[in-house]
């Protein structure tokens, strides 16, 4: 049976009133989870998982996957309206989404984000539909050196293509690495940066840190600036949506590049967060309007949202074909599959044909349903901007505190949130970028584990990162990204010298 025939069979299974109702419920719950800072898709799916034990596997996976898509969509809402990422992967969306909202373009930013998210997700689903066996064979070749090279590529891309001074970017990234190092060493078992405090044994909570750095830090800066949101700047109408859709086709190359980056990072897996940062950096580097990035450029919203959703969708590919989760949410879903008596791997496509293709079909329909539902809620969420900021600020602080408290149900997390908020405010005042810090905090421990495992495997030989064509190409790409500014300047100087020589010769 061909992929198309299998997909049509899956569509016939999913297109029932019961399953469509589960899609809408899952999307609505996911949007709520994505909007609330600190909760996130993995926690939301984990909380919902026990409720699926009495369902059939197809119904259960439809509910959980649609909650996942809704959370990815919802994470961009608070990122754009309040500069508070609902999801770690939505951090890059704040760079231009929030300035667009402040410039009175909240509707355009949200519409561009949601539409790009749908297109990115569909690319990921197409990859899963038609290239699953080939991608699974490719991902099977990855070991610790390849994983470290992928993370190194993410770090170097952000350093080499950042518009901030490289030294400040490195300092911010170093702080993030230090945050990621707190707790117990996973290799030796030694304690690092715990200062004899038991509550630091498990490390710093990323959710609490990002709520403080972005949420509280932004509130402090905004209060100092005396910002007041004006209602007329957040007017959302169907005409705004249609006008935004009319503009978006001109960014097809950004869409394509970001979708490919997202698929790559989802399958390898680098994750949606790294994919969104890399895509944003690449979009800024190659854009004709790069000077507008950070000031409210719609291309700066399109790139991270496309990559985020293509990576989030592609992350399910290694889970289904190899049993290797490509993201935290995929890991929770993997646990659900095991509980339901399913065993992910190459045989899953044969033994559980209806389940697999029902899931793939629900990915197509679920993302379309997500776009429709979230666009219908745009006026509701955008109307928040009409409320005076003196009223909104305490509400945001309260929501941040609830989100921080919900991570471990501990007041200590609320205190840490406030401390990270002060750090975020200080970094912003001194001109240090927060995004590299967040990237390093998210991927630092994973990169360290991959590096140390590579060193153990190779007896401490760095040549392991050039030991085969795959890891060598990844490492070479990382170094090229790191040295990109220098290479670009040298190439420009040589080009100008050549033009002068030609003029003199003439």
Per-range role (PLM):
Residues 68-80, 86, 297-322, 326, ...:
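A structural-propensity feature for long, helix-poor, extended segments
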Residues 58-62, 99-116, 288-301, 328-331, ...:
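Membrane-interface alpha-helices at helix entry/exit sites of multi-pass transporters
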Residues 27-41, 70-83, 158-163, 260-271, ...:
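Transmembrane alpha-helix interface/packing and boundary motifs in multi-pass membrane proteins
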Residues 47, 81-109, 134, 143, ...:
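Flexible loop linkers connecting adjacent transmembrane helices
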Residues 31, 47-50, 64-72, 113-118, ...:
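Transmembrane helix-bundle signature of multi-pass membrane transporters/permeases
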Residues 1-60, 133, 139-140, 191-297, ...:
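Helix-loop-helix hairpins and the membrane-proximal interhelical loops
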Residues 111-227, 339-489:
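Membrane-embedded alpha-helical modules
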């Amino acid at each position: 049976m061909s992929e198309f025939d299998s997909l049509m069979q899956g569509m016939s299974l999913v297109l029932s009133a019961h399953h469509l109702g589960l899609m809408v419920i899952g999307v609505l719950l996911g949007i709520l989870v994505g909007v609330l800072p600190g909760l996130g898709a993995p926690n939301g799916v984990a909380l919902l998982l026990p409720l699926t034990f009495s369902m059939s596997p197809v119904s259960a996976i439809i509910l959980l996957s649609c909650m996942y898509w809704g959370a990815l969509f919802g994470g961009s809402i608070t990122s754009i309206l309040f500069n508070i990422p609902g999801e770690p992967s939505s951090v890059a969306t704040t760079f231009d989404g929030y300035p667009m909202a402040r410039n009175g373009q909240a509707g355009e930013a949200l519409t561009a984000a949601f539409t790009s998210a749908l297109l990115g997700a569909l690319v990921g689903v197409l990859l899963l539909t038609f290239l699953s066996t080939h991608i699974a064979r490719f991902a099977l070749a990855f070991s610790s050196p390849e994983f470290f090279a992928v993370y190194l590529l993410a770090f170097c891309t952000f350093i080499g293509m950042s518009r901030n001074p490289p030294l400040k970017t490195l300092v911010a990234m170093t702080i993030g690495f230090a945050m990621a190092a707190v707790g117990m060493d996973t290799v030796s078992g030694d304690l690092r940066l715990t200062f004899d405090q038991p509550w630091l044994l498990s490390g710093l909570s990323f959710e609490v840190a990002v709520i403080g750095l972005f949420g509280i830090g932004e509130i402090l800066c905004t209060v100092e600036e005396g910002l007041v949101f004006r209602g007329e700047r957040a007017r959302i109408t169907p005409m705004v949506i249609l006008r935004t859709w009319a503009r978006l086709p001109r960014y097809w190359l950004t869409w394509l590049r970001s979708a490919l980056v997202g698929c790559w990072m989802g399958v390898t897996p680098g994750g949606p967060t790294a994919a969104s940062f890399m895509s944003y950096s690449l979009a800024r580097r190659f854009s004709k309007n790069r000077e507008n990035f950070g000031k409210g450029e719609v291309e700066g919203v399109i790139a991270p949202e496309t990559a985020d959703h293509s990576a989030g969708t592609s992350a399910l590919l290694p889970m289904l074909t190899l049993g290797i989760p490509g993201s935290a949410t995929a890991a929770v879903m993997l646990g659900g599959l095991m509980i339901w008596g399913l065993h992910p791997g190459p045989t899953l496509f044969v033994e559980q044909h209806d389940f697999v293709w029902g899931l793939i079909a629900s990915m197509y329909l679920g993302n379309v349903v997500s776009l429709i539902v979230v666009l219908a809620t745009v006026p509701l969420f955008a109307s928040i901007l009409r409320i005076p900021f003196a009223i909104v600020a305490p509400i945001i602080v309260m929501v941040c505190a609830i989100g921080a408290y919900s991570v471990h149900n501990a007041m200590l997390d609320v205190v840490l949130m406030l401390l990270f908020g002060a750090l975020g405010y200080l970094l912003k005042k001194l001109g240090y970028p927060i995004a590299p810090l967040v990237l390093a905090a998210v991927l630092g421990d994973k990169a360290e584990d991959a590096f140390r495992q590579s060193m153990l495997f190779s007896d401490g030989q760095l040549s392991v990162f050039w030991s085969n064509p795959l890891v060598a190409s990844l490492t070479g790409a990382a170094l090229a990204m790191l040295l990109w500014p220098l290479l670009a300047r040298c190439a420009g100087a040589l080009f100008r010298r050549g033009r002068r020589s030609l003029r003199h010769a003439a």
